[in-house]
């Protein structure tokens, strides 16, 4: 059952998002996973651009089954249900970077904050991770029914607990810039940019924006495979299949699929 404070927060959020072409808002004080709830909503027929968010998420997850830690009130978990249009079906693998671009553009448009996207889709601020993204698919038999876009954004101080041995140290927008962003303001700015950028998906303009946002471009990085072996190379860009383009020390051009390697700074 929702508490009064939860009802008030949901009302405030709906007011903040009024006028946006979204399919509805679901807010929780505490939830296991916004993506898991997104699956349930999608299975029940929730419309395109339905938004799920919470004050606290207790069972969040990231790519490669990694645990995503959400500190209550400081990190904002959110899921958006996407019902892809016919022309978007061939570009489903681009919705994850689209989400990263929407985060980047929201920070820039709303607060003048410049961030980068670490291939394939983490958002970095001062080379520290402030947003992670997990895009999942709901299948009905062999038919794709909907996309579940999940993201966790570290907004306020305390959102990134100190964890040893992280490849990319986590941080928050407030810690890196001193700027305090309210949850309703953040959600509105993000959704505005997601709506604005969505028609660009798969177009030359989409790839241009992604390249412009790419972290470590023209820099030497370490590319680590799942088995632990690694090599170095210079990041050159992204091809039309979403692959990372790298030149190795021998001068050979190599491309890598998302999930095939992990990118780490030297």
What are these regions (language model features)?
Residues 1-6, 21, 85-90, 94-115, ...:
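Long, positively charged amphipathic alpha-helical accessory segments at protein N-termini or as interdomain linkers
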Residues 1-109, 253:
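N-terminal lobe of the biotin/lipoate ligase/transferase fold
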């Amino acid at each position: 059952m929702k508490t009064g404070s939860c009802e008030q927060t949901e009302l405030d959020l709906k007011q903040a998002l009024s006028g946006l072409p979204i399919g509805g808002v679901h807010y929780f004080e505490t939830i296991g996973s916004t993506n898991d709830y997104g699956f349930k909503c999608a299975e029940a027929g929730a419309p395109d651009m339905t938004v799920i968010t919470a004050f606290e998420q207790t069972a969040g997850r990231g790519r490669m089954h990694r645990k995503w830690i959400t500190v209550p009130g400081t990190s904002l978990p959110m899921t958006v249900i996407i019902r892809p249009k016919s022309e978007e079906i061939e570009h489903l693998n681009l919705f994850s970077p689209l989400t990263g671009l929407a985060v980047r553009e929201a920070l820039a448009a709303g607060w003048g904050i410049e961030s980068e996207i670490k291939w394939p889709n983490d958002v970095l601020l001062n080379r520290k991770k402030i947003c992670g993204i997990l895009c999942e698919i709901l299948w009905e038999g062999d038919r794709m029914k909907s996309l579940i876009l999940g993201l966790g954004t570290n907004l306020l101080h305390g959102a990134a607990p100190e964890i040893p041995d992280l490849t990319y140290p986590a941080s928050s927008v407030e810690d890196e810039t001193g700027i305090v962003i309210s949850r309703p303001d953040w959600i509105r700015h993000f959704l505005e940019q997601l709506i604005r950028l969505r028609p660009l998906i798969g177009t030359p303009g989409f790839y241009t924006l992604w390249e412009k946002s790419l972290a470590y471009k023209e820099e030497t990085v370490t590319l680590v495979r799942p088995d632990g072996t690694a090599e170095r190379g210079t990041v050159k860009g992204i091809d039309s299949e979403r692959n990372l383009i790298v030149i190795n020390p021998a001068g050979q051009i190599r491309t890598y699929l998302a999930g095939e390697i992990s990118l780490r700074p030297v």
